[in-house]
Amino acid sequence: MDGATYQRFPKIKIRELKDDYAKFELRETDVSMANALRRVMISEVPTVAIDLVEIEVNSSVLNDEFIAHRLGLIPLTSERAMSMRFSRDCDACDGDGQCEFCSVEFRLSSKCVTDQTLDVTSRDLYSADPTVTPVDFTIDSSVSDSSEHKGIIIVKLRRGQELKLRAIARKGIGKDHAKWSPAATVTFMYEPDIIINEDMMDTLSDEEKIDLIESSPTKVFGMDPVTRQVVVVDPEAYTYDEEVIKKAEAMGKPGLIEISPKDDSFIFTVESTGAVKASQLVLNAIDLLKQKLDAVRLSDDTVEADDQFGELGAHMRGG
């Protein structure tokens, strides 16, 4: 349609925010944008992870490749990842991926000299760049020496066993390998729109109202102790199971409660691996999403645009 516009102005409202957790509302947009944001957070926000391991000495019970795999999965603080270069694009080292602009070097050297088992952990990795280090999950410094807060275990050594290695961490994205994903989990749900027919509800006895409330597997509804009316106490607890709707129909009251998802309102839950803070993860994803949308909007090659962003690219062009 000539003159049609799909322009919207999405809004975000923060509900809960911690270093590794965020919960927020995304409103005034559609599901294609919400899902695009979710996927960018999981697979396209860059982080730094160990990508190359040179084993010098390994007399532990684990093979070299086992240790290299474990090292790759250790989350590293990645606040500066957005400003780093991808090793494949770095002209300072001709793509070798071992310079200060595209990589960070780590060293590890541990040897067990007692009869006590020695735990080699992520805290034994020494970084050449103090801004890129293994994530410290210790919250309370007073318990930092406890067995639960010694870092991620890489291998256990017995007397005489030794592990010495050099590792190179590089910038990457989760689309290439899961070790670069900054997100432990990212989910969103449609915000439910729950409508109670008060006239029909008034025809029910208190016992029937209680039966209706208890038919929901999650505590979505409750009864007002003063008015004795059924009220919505936690709409977000609804899991779209339709049990309360089926109960109303079984009671001969179809239409007593109507529940539908709001197609322009979504509730996001984001958990970070610790590589970047949850708030920064969301902001970085939005920046990357804007870059992608600009590329789609300016692209003359519709096939290329659709490869880049699928259904959202077609939607933006009005297709």
UniProtKB/Swiss-Prot annotation:
Entry-annotated residues carrying N-acetylmethionine: 1
Localization terms from the record: Nucleus
Superkingdom to which the source organism belongs: Eukaryota
Membrane-spanning ranges: none
GO molecular function annotation: DNA binding; DNA-directed RNA polymerase activity; protein dimerization activity
Family: Belongs to the archaeal Rpo3/eukaryotic RPB3 RNA polymerase subunit family.
Protein name in UniProt: DNA-directed RNA polymerases II, IV and V subunit 3
Lineage: Eukaryota, Viridiplantae, Streptophyta, Embryophyta, Tracheophyta
